[in-house]
Curated annotation (Swiss-Prot):
GO terms for biological process: D-alanine biosynthetic process. This is Alanine racemase. The keyword Isomerase applies. It comes from the Bacteria. It holds the Pfam family Ala_racemase_C. The lineage of its organism: Bacteria, Pseudomonadati, Spirochaetota, Spirochaetia, Spirochaetales. It comes from Treponema denticola (strain ATCC 35405 / DSM 14222 / CIP 103919 / JCM 8153 / KCTC 15104). The gene is alr. Pathway: Amino-acid biosynthesis; D-alanine biosynthesis; D-alanine from L-alanine: step 1/1. Belongs to the alanine racemase family. GO terms for cellular component: cytosol. Its EC number is 5.1.1.1. Signal peptide: none annotated.
Length: 379
């Protein structure tokens, strides 16, 4: 097995689900997004652990992601959060995947395919309340709900929306989110007035789970919270979470270099004095962004900086003039904070350095990095 690996702490995942449940009203379900291979954590194993911890629904971004789960034996309901193309509809129906619907044309196409294949399609009507990505306008919601209700081979399983800035503490953004919630509630009222059961009503993402209890409705869709991070550092204090992914590698070579010796591409780092350099078999092709040069990584209880350019497959660290570090020592790039390692880097720390978000950090960990799953313990 490669020296570089992602350790997936499924016990932490289940801990996070328990913490989220504490914030939910009675009988509110959880739909866990496992798109992008569960944000890089491994969709199948994450889905199984999450279902054992009480997650009711799964969400994906593509039909292929849903098929992977079905073929692994997962029978829980799965929502596809992205719009499928016509060629994907037969597979969607075959594997009982619940798509979002947003317009008359797709509703008609889906009903036609379902009738031809003698299948029933369960759908979720997506209303655009402010994200401006996908969804029908609130003014069209009732008309489309009626169309679904009248379609012989369709059933309205739910109505949903998505919040654009629910993780923000800025007053303007709070006002915007509250407006989204209000528009969504009004749309649901109108659908009910038309005599149609909206099914599962769901809207809350991670930010709104923490800040807007009025947006819980029947089901919530927390993504990054389950994987151990608040969607914004400003919300860290609102919930106790444990990062699920730990990225580690090993020292594969140690060499002594003299003062004024340059390291790596472009010669952008030069030794100010005699020192030892350790090579690590991890680079930007594994998901360690080039912008993370300078990051201090942990060996034992000490931290050492990445020096020079991060290469495609390797990087180098300065371990000092009198190193105790040895070849094959384990190196932690990021992982959970613990009593043993209270100063561990987290994906949120790396995201701050790289000018991005933890989602991108974990999603970018390449498939060639093996995932090692620490079996969950349900308490």
């Amino acid at each position: 097995m490669r020296a570089t690996k992602a350790i997936i702490h499924l016990d932490n995942l289940q801990y996070n689900i328990k913490e989220i449940k504490k914030r939910l009203n009675k009988n509110v379900k959880i739909c866990l997004p496992v798109k992008a291979d569960a944000y890089g954590h491994g969709a199948v194993r994450v889905a199984v652990a999450a279902i054992r911890a009480g997650v009711s629904y799964l969400a994906v971004a593509s039909i292929q992601e849903a098929v992977e789960l079905r073929e692994a034996g997962i029978v829980a309901p799965i929502i596809s959060l992205s719009l499928p193309v016509l060629e994907e509809i037969p597979e969607l129906l075959k594997y009982d995947i619940e798509p979002l619907v947003i317009d008359e044309e797709f509703i008609n196409d889906l009903n036609r395919f379902a009738k031809k294949l003698n299948k029933k399609a369960w759908v979720h009507l997506k209303i655009d309340t402010g994200m401006r990505r996908i969804g029908c306008s609130p003014m069209e919601a009732v008309k489309l709900a009626v169309q679904i209700d009248r379609a012989e081979n369709l059933e309205l399983k739910g109505v949903c929306t998505h919040f654009a800035v629910s993780d923000s503490t800025d007053e303007k953004n709070i006002k915007f989110t509250k407006k989204q919630i209000s528009v969504f509630k009004d749309s649901i009222k109108e659908i009910k007035k038309a005599g149609i059961n909206p099914g599962l009503i769901h809207a809350a993402n991670s930010g709104s789970v923490l800040q807007y209890p009025e947006a819980q409705f029947d089901m919530v869709r927390p993504g990054i919270l389950v994987y151990g991070y608040a969607p914004s550092p400003s919300l860290n204090s609102l919930i106790d979470l444990k990062p699920v992914m730990e990225l580690v590698t090993q020292v594969v070579l140690i060499k002594k270099i003299e003062k004024d010796t340059s390291v790596s591409y472009d010669r952008c780092w030069t030794a100010e004095k005699e020192t030892f350099v350790a090579t690590l078999p991890i680079g930007y092709a594994d998901g360690l962004m080039r912008s993370l040069s300078g990051l201090k990584v942990r060996i034992g209880k000490d931290f050492f900086p990445i020096i020079g350019r991060i290469c495609m497959d390797q990087c180098m660290i300065d371990i000092g003039a009198s190193p105790w570090v040895q070849r094959w020592d384990e190196v932690c790039i990021f992982g959970p904070v613990s009593k043993e390692h209270p100063k561990n880097n987290t994906a949120q720390d790396l995201a701050k350095i790289a000018g991005t978000i933890p989602y991108e950090l974990t999603c970018d960990i390449n498939k060639r990095v093996p995932r090692i799953f620490i079996d969950e313990t349900i308490q």
